[in-house]
């Protein structure tokens, strides 16, 4: 996919850069593989804000994605490549030889008419899903499981992938884009190839309103608030906040480590850069 630039006939078009989606499916998604979504506005069941700067946005249907690739040893044909408003990657509608339809994450270079399969021992081909023990070292992967049978969790965003760098003592060692090296059980599944839409990182929304369409509200700085609302608030005139950057609850921010799950730290061979 290429990038689209626009003639600056309005100020918001001057900086706008979008991904060219002319080759994607133009119709509606498959109805049997969609669900309705209700908006939370960033609120939990008590009505309190748990995720700031969320709200509004265009109504969306959720596409049910098969992250587990649970149909084993049955070939499927790629019917079409579609846009999914719920994620940055594109998705592929596949039809199995027994007639069942399914959505999967579309890897780069997957084309309409390609045949893919999920198997214990399949060809090392774009879109095929295999256990890590059956994949040769050096292969580029996406949608990698962290627990056997749970479904892919690693490398699902646009343009992402991991590299299989080693196997030892029942675990595979994978290298993430962040530079982290992590151990994953050899029986976990992964799909061959990199995720589609690598140009997603180069887009420019062009105007604030386009962010509102995506469900994001304005991000207000702490120094622009009153003292009751933020530790950086208040002061006469424009101030710098008067202290090291903190969250609205007074905890240090900008680089402070927040990961607390020491139980699974043993699976991280090398921390991210």
Curated annotation (Swiss-Prot):
Record keywords: Ribonucleoprotein, Ribosomal protein, RNA-binding, rRNA-binding
GO biological process per UniProt: translation
One MF annotation (Gene Ontology) recorded for this entry: rRNA binding
Keyword DNA repair: no
GO cellular component, one term: large ribosomal subunit
Comp. bias regions, Basic residues: 254-273
Any Pfam family matching the protein: Ribosomal_L2
Reported function: One of the primary rRNA binding proteins. Required for association of the 30S and 50S subunits to form the 70S ribosome, for tRNA binding and peptide bond formation. It has been suggested to have peptidyltransferase activity; this is somewhat controversial. Makes several contacts with the 16S rRNA in the 70S ribosome.
Subunit structure: Part of the 50S ribosomal subunit. Forms a bridge to the 30S subunit in the 70S ribosome.
Family membership: Belongs to the universal ribosomal protein uL2 family.
NCBIfam families according to UniProt: rplB_bact
Name of this chain's protein: Large ribosomal subunit protein uL2
Organism: Rickettsia typhi (strain ATCC VR-144 / Wilmington)
């Amino acid at each position: 996919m290429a990038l689209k630039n626009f003639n600056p006939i309005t100020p918001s078009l001057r900086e706008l850069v979008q991904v060219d989606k002319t080759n994607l499916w133009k119709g509606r998604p498959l109805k049997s593989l969609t669900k309705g979504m209700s908006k939370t506005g960033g609120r939990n069941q008590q009505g309190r804000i748990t995720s700031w700067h969320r709200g509004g946005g265009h109504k969306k249907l959720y596409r049910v994605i098969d992250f587990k690739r649970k149909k084993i040893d049955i070939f499927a044909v790629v019917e079409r490549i579609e846009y999914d408003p719920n994620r940055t990657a594109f998705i592929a509608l596949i039809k199995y030889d027994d007639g069942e339809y399914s959505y999967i994450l579309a890897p780069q270079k997957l084309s309409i008419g390609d045949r893919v399969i999920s198997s214990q021992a399949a060809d090392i081909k774009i879109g095929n899903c295999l256990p890590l023990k059956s994949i040769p070292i050096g292969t580029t992967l996406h949608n990698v499981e962290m627990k056997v049978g749970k479904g892919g969790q690693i490398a699902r965003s646009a343009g992402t992938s991991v590299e299989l760098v080693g196997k030892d003592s029942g675990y595979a060692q994978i290298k993430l884009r962040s530079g982290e090296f992590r151990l994953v059980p050899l029986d976990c599944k992964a799909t061959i190839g990199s995720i589609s839409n690598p140009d997603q990182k180069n887009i420019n929304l062009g105007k604030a309103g386009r962010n509102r369409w995506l469900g994001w509200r304005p991000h207000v700085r702490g120094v622009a608030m009153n003292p009751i609302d933020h530790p950086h608030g208040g002061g006469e005139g424009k101030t710098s906040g008067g202290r090291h950057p903190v969250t609205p609850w007074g905890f240090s921010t900008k680089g402070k480590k927040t990961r607390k799950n020491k139980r699974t730290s043993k699976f991280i061979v090398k921390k991210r850069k």
